[in-house]
Amino acid sequence: MSLNMPFLKYNDNKKIRVRPDFTICLVLAVCVCIVYGQVHDFEFTNYDDGDYVLINPHIKDGLTLESVRWAFVTNHASNWHPVTWLSHMVDIELYGMNPGAHHLMNVLFHILNTLLLFMILNRMTRRIWESAVVALLFAVHPLHVESVAWISERKDVLCTLWAFLSIWAYMNYVKTSRIVHLAASLFLFCLGLMSKPMIVSLPVLLMLLDYWPLNRIPVNKISTVRDFFR
């Protein structure tokens, strides 16, 4: 009996070896853990964490009908992002008011985002090592410290997750032309909007990806549009 393990492959001598993309994903996850594992010892901050979790009665109640309703109708903290509120409520249900666990959830989302970025780039370009380098920069770049190490910035890592999943679904649509994949991409985009509105620019990004590397827009059509505006 043989086991189907997609992260393994056989060489010409029938010897098992681990696929390089699986190894890269493992290394990327370890790098994120090395850089951000320390957040487990961090506390809540006095900047926005109170509004988002610490003294927010709707969040502290966890997943109740009233709290869920509140998440979809409130513009508390000058934001409408019900999915972000719901994620904080789920944290309360799972970990209570343990700040380290809330921080580690952000780290988990960042790991998922890093792996998704690598898989998206590798799938689109078929350049595995260049994709790995870009994903590594994304994983450990200091610009992401605020988004990962600050509980109130859950909306950033959550929005990014939906954006990458939406791109992946769109790539499936490009490959298969099945409308279900396009609908999935749109649904994930809507979840991103309900996490943080900055994802609103995603359709423009998809158009750019259509040009390169998906090559769905021929160069001659770009020239025609350019000539029209001359």
State each model region's role.
Residues 1-230:
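Polytopic membrane enzymes that build or remodel cell-surface glycoconjugates and lipids
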